[in-house]
């Protein structure tokens, strides 16, 4: 719909000036919900009002008519805006904030009493551009990403930025790994070319990952335009100042910066130069595996019960975010992994230091996000105070290290704590300027210390002691005139005035007393001195707030000059938090330092699943540990055995141990020797409650296909019940072939759980495949799952025992036992004939009488009969009754 059509639709020509102003702004932001500031409220009109009233649960009213059409309206108080924004952002709406750029008085002075207050959009809030603490999760990043697919389509470029922390990164991603990389980052919003709207990629991003896509015209990503944006933003003359980057990376960075400029209205934070990373520096974990292993969220999308929630004992927000990033991006470089492990080991060996540091870290603030708010002019005095207190605490933390080690600290610890020395100049600046009781809102005043600026002190003196100055002036005028009854009073018409009785009028001789008003018994005067005092008193509040804002802006600009240092300090504190956290959980849960090799070792002794173990501990139960010994000669474990015996837990725990080890943490085991894993793949079905919705055979095959296509020799594959979604013969054939492919072609490490016992014969001709099963203890018809993985193959699945534990009716279990017995008496190759015989001999709706059930009923009946007491008639009736039972 073009502009003329829009104006016609909304009766623009007959609308009031204020409503025309609204429509002009709305027409320029049709893709947004427009919140229009009117006094103390943000109002919404027309369709926006109807939508917002439903989403926010607020009353829908009307604001008169526009022509014949009634104007729908709803609004929210300006001071509660963030509460309502939270709901809108959660629903993925794009919100434009339209503020008043002048006061009504200023508008009147500019254009008379009919002038409309000037308004404009000051910011557009989207899921990927939030910085408000109340609107974003404190313990995870909030990424905006731009994805650029070059014409060759072999490698895509991805730039992602967290506006709340000023982190900006660019990476080239193989086309086949785009979804996996997006799953790692979990961006809140993705910029994509309009040309890709109908592509399979866009469909997968939306349907599989459920991420918000914001489409932009193709020219938004144009190379020359994006290059100019980058050069202008970073004030560079040559794009090489960014580093060695491709054309598509330039487009990705430039489009992100342009989008930030459009949404923040030029008020973009001081972003550092983008960090260029190598995609292969991190372990690849596809989106399905992340979901199956519940790394940062559980199957419902919450953090509770996830690996992150189990490992996260950090004490700062920035530390929590860093741990989130570590878990999302395990390392693949042995040197870097060992560097982290050495840091963890240092703290594990110094638990007393850890205890002190963790207590001190609790006193620090999230200065990354404080700094962002400062650079975007959305901060308060409390942000500066947070920086001051953090600077102070940082120096104390450094003293803890030197008290214990002096100058003999390992180099890798020295490097971490170097920024903790503080910045005396910055600390003193804030300490000398910002009041300890500084309010959240600059408009409330009282943020600058009085002694910092004489004018601030003077204005606050007027505000606090105005009555005293009036009293002094009154005493002065009484002395000058000799009128002891002279008063200084106030009314809303003439303001402050000197009031004397009519009989004393002859005593007013000095011409400085200017007549204002005469009443029956009183005469009122003013003086230039009184008028000046009144003006100062009336304007003192406004003047001091204006002056404080000016001074505050200057202080903030000086803080921004220290941005690089503050980011290093934040990085140091978050790193300390994470590594102290690793030491803490290693001590608390008995974790061990893993050893890394450059071969295919995966030697875990007494490994445990950290999440399951913690859940069992809450119930005062013990976790049954297990070994896993994969190597070049024994790459594949084929695991058979009953359901509910712990197969899935065993599979997951080994994948999780690899992830934990490669983030630099100790692991839940007695010992661990691991050849670096470059990719982890996990195929686990819906029956294990780790995938939302109903799993299908096609979904299973698609995931298995992707695993076989993307795995390398250094990958770890976890497969659970491949082939179960189709017929037995098809399933066995597929599982067999998949195992052969992994063994002969991929030659990588694999844990393969199955209920197809036919596969166990493969160990006879696949030398790197070994059979393992779950230990079972049988006692009559009862079984006990021991949860131990042992060498060997299961001879049956014990499915009927699990069914009985699940509470299936006894008659169903008994009948199933009969049918199973017939199958077991017949060779596997004749299974089809068994079913045919059953269907031919028995009606579809008829079950052969259950002998076990009949026997139990007869036993029960006979137990109540005393033959010596039966009459002939009762005996005959009993015979008929028994006949009915059989």
UniProtKB/Swiss-Prot annotation:
SMART domains: MUTSac, MUTSd. Keywords: ATP-binding, DNA damage, DNA repair, DNA-binding, Nucleotide-binding. It comes from the Bacteria. Pfam families: MutS_I, MutS_II, MutS_III, MutS_IV, MutS_V. One of its GO terms (molecular function) is damaged DNA binding. One of its GO terms (biological process) is mismatch repair. ATP binds at residues 641-648. HAMAP family: MutS. Belongs to the DNA mismatch repair MutS family. This is DNA mismatch repair protein MutS. It comes from Rickettsia rickettsii (strain Sheila Smith). The lineage of its organism: Bacteria, Pseudomonadati, Pseudomonadota, Alphaproteobacteria, Rickettsiales. The gene is mutS.
């Amino acid at each position: 719909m073009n502009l003329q059509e829009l104006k016609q639709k909304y009766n623009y020509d007959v609308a009031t000036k204020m409503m025309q102003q609204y429509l002009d702004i709305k027409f320029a932001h049709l893709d947004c919900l427009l919140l229009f500031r009117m006094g103390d409220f943000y109002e919404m009109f027309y369709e926006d009002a109807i939508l917002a009233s439903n989403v926010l649960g607020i009353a829908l009213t009307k604001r008169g008519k526009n022509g014949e059409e009634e104007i729908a309206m709803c609004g929210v108080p300006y001071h509660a805006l963030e509460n309502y924004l939270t709901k809108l952002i959660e629903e993925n709406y794009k919100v434009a904030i339209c503020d008043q750029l002048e006061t009504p008085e200023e508008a009147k002075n500019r254009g008379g009493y009919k002038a409309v207050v000037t308004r404009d959009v000051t910011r557009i809030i989207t899921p990927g551009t939030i910085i408000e603490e109340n609107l974003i999760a404190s313990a995870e990043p909030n990424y905006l990403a731009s994805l650029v697919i070059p014409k060759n389509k072999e490698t895509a470029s991805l730039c992602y930025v967290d506006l709340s922390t000023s982190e900006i990164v660019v990476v080239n991603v193989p086309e086949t790994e785009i979804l996996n990389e997006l799953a790692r980052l979990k961006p809140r919003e993705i910029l994509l070319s309009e040309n890709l709207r109908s592509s399979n990629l866009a469909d997968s991003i939306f349907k599989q990952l459920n991420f918000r896509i914001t489409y932009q015209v193709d020219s938004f990503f144009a190379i020359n335009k994006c290059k100019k944006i980058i050069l202008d933003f970073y004030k560079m003359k040559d794009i090489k100042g960014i580093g060695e980057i491709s054309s598509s990376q330039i487009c990705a960075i430039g489009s992100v910066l342009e989008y930030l400029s459009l949404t923040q209205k030029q008020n973009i934070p001081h972003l550092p130069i983008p960090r260029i990373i190598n995609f292969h520096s991190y372990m690849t974990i596809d989106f399905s595996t992340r979901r199956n292993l519940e790394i940062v969220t559980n199957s419902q999308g919450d953090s509770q019960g996830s690996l992150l929630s189990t490992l996260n004992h950090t004490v700062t927000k920035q530390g929590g975010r860093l741990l989130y990033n570590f878990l999302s991006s395990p390392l693949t470089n042995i040197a870097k992994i060992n560097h982290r492990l050495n840091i963890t080991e240092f703290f594990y060996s110094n638990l007393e230091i850890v205890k002190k540091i963790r207590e001190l870290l609790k006193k620090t603030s999230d200065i990354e996000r404080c700094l962002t708010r400062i650079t975007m002019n959305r901060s308060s005095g409390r942000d500066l105070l947070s920086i001051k207190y953090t600077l102070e605490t940082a120096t104390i933390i450094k003293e803890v290290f030197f008290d214990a080690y002096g100058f003999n600290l390992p180099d890798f610890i020295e490097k971490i704590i170097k920024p903790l020395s503080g910045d005396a100049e910055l600390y003193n600046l804030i300490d000398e300027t910002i009041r300890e009781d500084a309010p959240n809102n600059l408009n409330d005043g009282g943020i600058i210390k009085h002694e910092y600026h004489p004018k601030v002190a003077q204005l606050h003196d007027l505000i606090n002691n105005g009555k005293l100055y009036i009293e002094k002036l009154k005493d002065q005028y009484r002395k000058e005139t000799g009128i002891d009854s002279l008063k200084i009073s106030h009314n809303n018409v003439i303001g402050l005035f000197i009031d004397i009785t009519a009989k004393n009028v002859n005593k007013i001789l000095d011409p400085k007393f200017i007549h204002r008003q005469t009443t029956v018994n009183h005469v009122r005067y003013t003086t230039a001195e009184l008028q000046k005092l009144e003006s100062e008193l009336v304007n003192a509040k406004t003047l001091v707030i204006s002056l404080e804002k000016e001074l505050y802006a200057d202080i903030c600009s000086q803080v921004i000059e220290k941005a690089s240092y503050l980011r290093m300090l934040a990085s140091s504190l978050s790193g300390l938090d994470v590594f102290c956290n690793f030491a803490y959980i290693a001590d608390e849960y008995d974790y061990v330092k893993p050893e890394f090799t450059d071969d295919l070792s995966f030697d875990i002794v007494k490994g445990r699943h950290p999440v399951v173990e913690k859940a069992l501990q809450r119930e005062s139960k013990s976790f049954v540990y297990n070994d896993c010994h994969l190597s070049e000669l024994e790459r594949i474990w084929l695991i058979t055995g009953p359901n509910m015996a712990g197969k899935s837990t065993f599979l997951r725990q080994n994948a999780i141990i690899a992830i934990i080890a490669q983030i630099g943490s100790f692991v839940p085991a007695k010992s661990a020797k691991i050849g670096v894993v470059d990719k982890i793949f996990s195929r686990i079905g819906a029956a294990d409650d780790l995938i939302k919705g109903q799993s299908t055979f096609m979904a299973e095959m698609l995931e298995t296909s992707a695993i076989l296509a993307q795995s390398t020799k250094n990958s770890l594959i976890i497969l659970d019940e491949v082939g179960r979604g189709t017929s037995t013969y098809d399933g066995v054939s597929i599982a067999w072939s998949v195992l052969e492919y992994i063994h002969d072609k991929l030659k990588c490490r694999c844990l393969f759980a199955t209920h197809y016992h036919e596969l166990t014969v493969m160990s006879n001709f696949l030398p790197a495949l070994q059979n393992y099963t779950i230990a079972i203890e049988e006692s009559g018809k009862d079984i006990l799952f021991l949860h131990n993985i042992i060498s060997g193959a299961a001879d049956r699945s014990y499915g009927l025992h699990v069914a009985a534990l699940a509470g299936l009716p006894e008659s169903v279990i008994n009948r199933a036992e009969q049918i199973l017995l017939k199958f077991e008496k017949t060779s596997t190759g004749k299974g089809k004939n068994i079913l045919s015989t059953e269907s031919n001999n028995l009606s579809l709706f008829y079950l052969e009488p259950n002998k076990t059930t009949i026997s139990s009923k007869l036993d029960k009946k006979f137990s109540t009969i005393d033959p010596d007491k039966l009459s002939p008639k009762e005996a005959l009736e009993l015979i008929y009754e028994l006949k009915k039972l059989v």
